[in-house]
Design a protein with these regions (language model features):
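Zinc-dependent deaminase catalytic domain
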Residues: 1-137
Length: 137
């Protein structure tokens, strides 16, 4: 058997992040993240609530109870708390903070400011955002 097109490592790990994103139970968006060091996955995660808690899609998230269109005009969307952790946070927790130094994190969407801060705190050396190229942390 001849392999005509073998995916690059970045493509491979980004696909793994996409698979993790599909596990998300958020009613608004599905995001996945994978922390990789020396071509080995050391942590993975998706946005979601803690194990054993009521999932967002099952009505467990106060923020997810309203669609964007249902939020009253002039109201701050952030007044309703999100009860889940973001994919990046879950992946770093799964890897262990100390293990993340110098690693690469693959995410399916651009990290928010809090996740960017966490990525920097974890000393992750490289961030790869799905479909958007490579961005240094």
């Amino acid at each position: 058997m001849i392999i005509s097109q073998r995916p690059e490592w970045d493509e491979t790990f980004q696909e793994i992040a996409r698979i993790w994103a599909s596990r998300s139970t958020c009613s608004r968006r599905q995001v996945g993240a994978v922390v990789v060091k020396d071509k080995h996955v050391i942590g993975q995660g998706y946005n979601g609530v803690a194990s054993g808690k009521k999932h967002c899609v099952d009505g467990g998230c106060p923020r997810g109870m309203l669609s964007y269109d249902e939020v009253p005009a002039g109201a701050d969307y952030n007044q309703w708390p999100c009860t889940s952790l973001h994919a990046e946070h879950n992946a770093i927790l799964n890897a262990g903070l100390a293990a993340c130094a110098g690693a690469t994190i693959y995410v399916t969407d651009k990290p928010c400011q809090q996740c960017t801060n966490l990525i920097e705190h974890a000393k992750i050396g490289r961030v790869v955002i799905g479909g958007r190229g490579i961005v240094s942390a």
